[in-house]
Amino acid sequence: MSKEPTAAAGLQNRFRTHYCGLLNRDSEGAGVKLGGWVHRIRDHGGLIFIDLRDHTGICQLVIQPESGELFRIAEGLHSESVISAEGSVVLRSDETVNPRLASGAIEVVVSAIKIESAAHPLPFPVADYMPTSEELRLKYRFLDLRRERLHENIIFRSQLTAAVRKYLTDLDFIEIQTPILTSSSPEGARDFLVPSRLHPGKFYALPQAPQQFKQLLMVSGFPRYFQIAPCFRDEDARADRSPGEFYQVDIEMSFVEQDDLFVILEGMFKHLVETMTTKRIAQYPFPRISYKDVMNRYGSDKPDLRIPIEIQDVTELFVNSGFKVFASNTKEGCCVKAMVLKGMGNESRLFYDKAEKRARELGSAGLAYIQFKEEAPKGPVVKFLKEEEMAALKEQLGIETGDVVFFGAGKWEQTCKIMGGMRNYFADVFPLDRDELSFCWIVDFPMFEYNEEDKKIDFSHNPFSMPQGEMEALEQHSPLDILAYQYDIVCNGIELSSGAIRNHRPDIMYKAFEIAGYPHDEVDARFGHMIEAFKHGAPPHGGIAPGLDRLVMILRDEQNIREVIAFPMNQSAQDLMMAAPSEVTAQQLKELHIKVELPEEEA
């Protein structure tokens, strides 16, 4: 919660001279005016107690029966009505002190009270927590935002945003706003399109990110840029992704290398964690893991490093195995992976059946495992393995009696992802420390990948990243062996941001697009404005853009991103409170030269 002076500095008027949650023993004897919401009201045998709430907290008002008209007004109050009250601060008796409230040592004896706004019956309680459907919470978001946890989340978000601004401006970053109405880009997610009235048949797009603008700012000579940037993407919702719009801490720097950006971001996150939370960072500086290594060891490019399980490669152990399922996957491009769960080898059959079901959901044909029981190893693949293979497994994996080892075999990428999915599935077995923040950088992403569907080389991630080795790499190396200066920052299994050192040279850009099958004229048609700018002197530059919503979500221990956004949409990208999206009038459509053709309803 924000810390403000007890007196309402600069706001002393007929409504308020003090804040409820900031009154304390030092306020004894003070005459105060308070304004807020009726949190609770209790009638204790002639005395009426009102818990009055403002954004700083709660204080108790006392109305005595001899108050006459005041008592009558208080008797008619309902929860969440807005009142203003005047009175004197007195100390509570020792036995009535409420240690759960910051103002619990005092109460205000009321001498005047006024109902500013009477509340109708509530669709759900604000003062007392009661499970409430998300639909109802979003429809009455103005009530939901009064609830303590959500209210504190929004205040925390404001404080975090202010701290980010101060940290970056202290490092000589310049905050610059970029356009909200811009041109549509065919790359990435779907755009939100805005029709132009003045240019019939043409459309603006809301920016998916200020990517091109911030790079152009580097070309314009601004060395360090940032913006708390709104971004708009027409994509489906997830627990950690809000549909429609989100905010990111957009950062770009010129004349930098990858390590320079890492130092800035690590310092900022460390500062935010240490000054705004009681959490601790597991390792600082943050560990850096190559894409290939992170897939081999964790089966995901956004690993939760708190999970005490690591995937190991056992391909070499089965090159000459009689177990064909493993032996057939020791060839180039395939692998055999293993994962040990310490002390979990004596679980019930149901445990393994559920695990196999999850593996099939992830795309596996099944789930091979061996339980290393005290009497003898047990499991569906034991009979296929030789004694020396079992011994080699135990030695390489450090297996002890009571452990269980799970296997995956097949094409490298698919097998890694399935094993990574199982690693996350088994995470529930282990108590994870919610106060530990395991940040890491994922680096050395491949520049290109082979598109199986189109049977061609394509960009694996950002086509505007600088290839490691620059032009020499593009001309002399196989495309699938080229790495890019691309990086992700991950915390506790959540990707906070992607970033890159940009490709600022038109010759390298043309060559990279040529490898991916794009001729010069197509590159010029799509990105001519960027290339034109780069032809007029572009400095080396790079950037990153951590998601503000996700960062608040992690630091506040929330499982759903809608718990850190004031007015979010639902899973179907609808604003239930404002009834958006909505139909518009025929006149509005006519002015925009638009005709709506709705899809035919299925029979």
Curated annotation (Swiss-Prot):
SUPFAM superfamilies: Class II aaRS and biotin synthetases (SSF55681), GAD domain-like (SSF55261), Nucleic acid-binding proteins (SSF50249). The record marks 44 as: Important for tRNA non-discrimination. It is found in: Cytoplasm. L-aspartate binds at residues 187, 233, 461, 502. Keywords: Aminoacyl-tRNA synthetase, ATP-binding, Cytoplasm, Ligase, Nucleotide-binding, Protein biosynthesis. Its EC number is 6.1.1.23. Residues 211-214 are annotated as: Aspartate. ATP binds at residues 233-235, 495, 547-550. One of its GO terms (biological process) is aspartyl-tRNA aminoacylation. GO terms for cellular component: cytoplasm. It catalyses: tRNA(Asx) + L-aspartate + ATP = L-aspartyl-tRNA(Asx) + AMP + diphosphate. GO terms for molecular function: aspartate-tRNA ligase activity; aspartate-tRNA(Asn) ligase activity; ATP binding; nucleic acid binding. It is an enzyme of class 6 (ligase). Its main location: cytoplasm. Homodimer. Aspartyl-tRNA synthetase with relaxed tRNA specificity since it is able to aspartylate not only its cognate tRNA(Asp) but also tRNA(Asn). Reaction proceeds in two steps: L-aspartate is first activated by ATP to form Asp-AMP and then transferred to the acceptor end of tRNA(Asp/Asn). PANTHER family: ASPARTATE--TRNA LIGASE, MITOCHONDRIAL, ASPARTYL/LYSYL-TRNA SYNTHETASE. Belongs to the class-II aminoacyl-tRNA synthetase family. Type 1 subfamily. This is Aspartate--tRNA(Asp/Asn) ligase. It comes from Chlorobaculum parvum (strain DSM 263 / NCIMB 8327) (Chlorobium vibrioforme subsp. thiosulfatophilum).
